[in-house]
């Protein structure tokens, strides 16, 4: 089992290669985000990711940078 919502077998991330969710710097996050959009746990995963600023990789269809921008906007 890896990070993400992988503890739930219905999570798309539980059924795929963990490397997809943690692309190296400069690699595209597009494929991971596309998979997230099909996941039944998208909303729960995104909410978790927005609450925890220490998470890295793609969570809930958002990159770490996108989540930082959202959190920054919410606190303004």
UniProtKB/Swiss-Prot annotation:
Entry keyword Methyltransferase: no
Binding site for [4Fe-4S] cluster: 13, 36, 39, 45
An example Gene Ontology CC term for this record: host cell cytoplasm
Domain of life: Viruses
GO MF term set: 4 iron, 4 sulfur cluster binding; DNA binding; metal ion binding; protein-disulfide reductase [NAD(P)H] activity
Cofactor(s) this protein requires: [4Fe-4S] cluster
Consequence when changing residue 58 to E: Small orange colonies in M.smegmatis, poor DNA-binding. Decreased DNA-binding
Cofactor comment text: Binds 1 [4Fe-4S] cluster per subunit. Contains 1 [2Fe-2S] cluster after reconstitution of overexpressed protein from E.coli. Following nitrosylation of the [4Fe-4S] cluster binds 1 [4Fe-8(NO)] cluster per subunit.
One Gene Ontology term from the biological process aspect of the record: negative regulation of DNA-templated transcription
Boundaries of every 4Fe-4S Wbl-type domain copy: 12-69
Keyword Nucleotidyltransferase set for record: no
Family according to the record: Belongs to the WhiB family.
Subunit structure: Forms homodimers in the absence of a reducing agent.
Protein name: Probable transcriptional regulator WhiBTM4
Originating species: Mycobacterium phage TM4
Lineage: Viruses, Duplodnaviria, Heunggongvirae, Uroviricota, Caudoviricetes
Gene coding for it: whiBTM4
């Amino acid at each position: 089992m890896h990070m993400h919502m992988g503890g739930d077998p219905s999570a798309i991330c539980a059924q795929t290669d963990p490397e997809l969710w943690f692309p190296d710097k400069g690699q595209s996050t597009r494929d991971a985000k596309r998979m997230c959009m099909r996941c039944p746990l998208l909303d729960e995963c995104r909410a978790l990711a927005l609450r925890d600023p220490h998470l890295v990789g793609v969570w809930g269809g958002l990159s770490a940078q996108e989540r930082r921008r959202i959190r920054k906007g919410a606190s303004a």
